[in-house]
């Protein structure tokens, strides 16, 4: 539930880093002294000094080249990735629609996944029962809803994940590229549903390489480049700056 704070998401001085194995030669002495200890690791910053505030009801596009950090930023907003430092404040119920299949249990059927994920979203058994048929109908999976998810194509996983994520009006909807998978008809259906969610006052954060799609959905953009925020502003201006990166 939304409180009286005037923002949906606020990030203050956020850094995110990953630890990777060092490259290059390692001396025999270093190897011997490291036995039984943590392997040699390099600290690689993926995001640095991120400051961003998104207000309730805003529709924001995250734009940037591959590897810029925009998808990592979306995962930070969803709570999947913890920052190395900094503060993250989220004011509302978040529905993340990120990488294909994330959150789905592959050994379970589609219908079993509906029950599981709806329960994890905080729904009561009565709500789950009421929403299940609506989810199945929106997904257009038909009899495949009784298959194990490991038999699904990527498009079928997208249908199921999206249908579950949007069944209840979220306060904040996070979308990362996944709507580009599957047939055009279902993509249009999903975008129409996102527009309906937006019209009811939800905050939308959208990552896509399709600028026309982004422009129709979002009025504001954030340009992410080399792990930092280069620019925040009107979507047209952000789009122009984005195009100059290539």
Which sequence ranges carry the predicted segments?
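The feature captures the beta-strand-to-loop junction immediately N-terminal to the Walker
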Residues: 63-65
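A short, surface-exposed alpha-helical micro-motif characterized by mixed small hydrophobic
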Residues: 214-216
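Conserved ABC ATPase "signature" region
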Residues: 29-34, 115, 127-144
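H-loop/switch region of ABC-family ATPase nucleotide-binding domains
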Residues: 208-209
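Pre-NBD coupling/linker segments of ABC/ABC-like ATPases
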Residues: 1-46, 236-245
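Conserved ABC ATPase "signature" C-loop
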Residues: 226-227, 242
């Amino acid at each position: 539930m939304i409180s009286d704070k005037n923002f949906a998401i606020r990030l203050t001085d956020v850094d995110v880093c990953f630890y990777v194995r060092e490259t290059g030669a390692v001396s025999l002495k270093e190897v011997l002294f490291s036995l039984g200890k943590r392997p040699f690791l390099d600290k690689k910053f993926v995001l640095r000094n991120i400051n961003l505030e998104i207000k309730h009801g805003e529709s924001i596009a995250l734009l940037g080249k591959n590897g810029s950090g925009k998808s990592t930023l979306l995962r930070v907003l969803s709570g999947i990735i913890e920052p190395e430092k900094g503060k993250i404040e989220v004011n509302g119920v978040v529905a993340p629609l990120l990488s294909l299949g994330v959150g789905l249990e592959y050994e379970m059927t589609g219908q079993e996944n509906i029950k599981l994920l709806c329960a994890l979203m905080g729904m009561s058994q009565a709500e789950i029962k009421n929403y299940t048929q609506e989810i199945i109908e929106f997904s257009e999976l038909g009899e495949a809803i009784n298959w194990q998810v490991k038999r699904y194509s990527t498009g079928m996983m997208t249908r199921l994940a999206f249908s579950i994520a949007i069944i209840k009006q979220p306060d904040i909807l996070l979308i990362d590229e996944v709507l580009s998978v599957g047939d055009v008809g279902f993509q249009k259906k999903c975008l129409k549903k996102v527009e309906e969610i937006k019209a009811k006052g939800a905050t939308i954060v959208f990552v896509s390489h399709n600028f026309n799609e982004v422009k129709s959905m979002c009025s504001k953009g954030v340009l992410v480049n080399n792990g930092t925020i280069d620019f925040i502003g009107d979507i047209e201006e952000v789009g122009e700056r984005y195009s100059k990166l290539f």
